């Protein structure tokens, strides 16, 4: 039987209250706080924190930045995300090399049942 994280990564219905997923979101929240408040958008601490939060990002993200997990965001070399973006990365988000994303952009992969029969 597949765990809830595996279901989420496969694009299937999953329980977001699962302990592993809750721990992953809590970790992302702590790293986002460090990135958005303590790192000031530059330097080794910023690059290290961004790498911990989003290990598949090869570009630059301006703060403030918000995501659910971080590990589901893939950005190519030379890509740039401007201020105040939200990436809800319950499913993979793939951004190609050299892509420029403006301020306040939201990339939302979250889904939920739209029929009471699925609840």
Annotated model-derived regions:
Residues 1-58:
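Terminal amphipathic alpha-helical/low-complexity segments used for targeting or macromolecular assembly
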Residues 57, 63, 68-71, 76-77, ...:
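Left-handed beta-helix
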